[in-house]
Regions:
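Short loop/turn motifs at secondary-structure junctions and domain boundaries
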Residues: 56-61
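Acyl-donor (CoA/ACP) binding surface of acyl/acetyltransferases
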Residues: 1-35, 65-175
Length: 175
């Protein structure tokens, strides 16, 4: 697949992080609706979610959504997002990732997060990349550790407590 003008494409050894194709957006909506509650705060507005995914592949106002592609098939999605009601300092990006259930445990989340983190530091002037996760999400916590992130405290948001993981530019460069 060729990238459109200005679209972000990140290539790894097995994965390609790329813009979602229009035909893939409904599938991503269904994946969101069927998400494990451990992974999301709440289901977003469908129209707004789909509109955001139509801008996939472009970093716009702190938001970037990319498909996680394995051999031409979408196996998940990775994103930066702006948390509702919480301002991020300049150069700080919050990240979310979701993989299809059938491909978990094979290192794809680790590779996607490493590729995305590196791209944010290299191309988006990131100083800090962080992500909240549910304390019970042991697989995601392990992925953060494998990629060099560390737990940086807790955050209470939307009535839930989240563990915050992060990595700074200096930590990324020193790994």
């Amino acid at each position: 697949m060729d990238a459109g003008p200005g679209e972000i494409v990140i290539r790894g050894s097995r994965l390609l992080l790329r813009a979602l194709r229009p035909a893939e957006i409904d599938g991503q909506w269904q994946a969101m609706v069927n998400s494990d509650p451990i992974a999301i705060v709440r289901i977003p507005d469908e129209a707004g979610f789909k509109a955001r995914l139509r801008r996939s592949g472009q970093l716009v106002d702190g938001w970037l959504d990319l498909a996680i592609d394995l051999d031409g098939a979408v196996i998940g999605r990775i994103q930066t997002f702006v948390p509702e009601g919480r301002r991020l300092p300049p150069g700080t990006f919050d990240v979310g990732i979701g993989l299809d259930e059938g491909v978990r445990g094979k290192g794809y989340g680790r590779e996607a997060l490493a590729l995305f983190t590196g791209w944010l530091f290299e191309h988006a002037a990131a100083q800090v990349v962080e992500a909240p996760t549910d304390p019970g999400n042991a697989p995601m916590r392990a992925v953060f550790g494998h990629v060099g992130w560390s737990q940086a405290g807790t955050l209470t948001e939307h009535g839930r407590e989240w563990l915050m993981y992060r990595i700074t530019r200096q930590e990324w460069q020193a790994r």
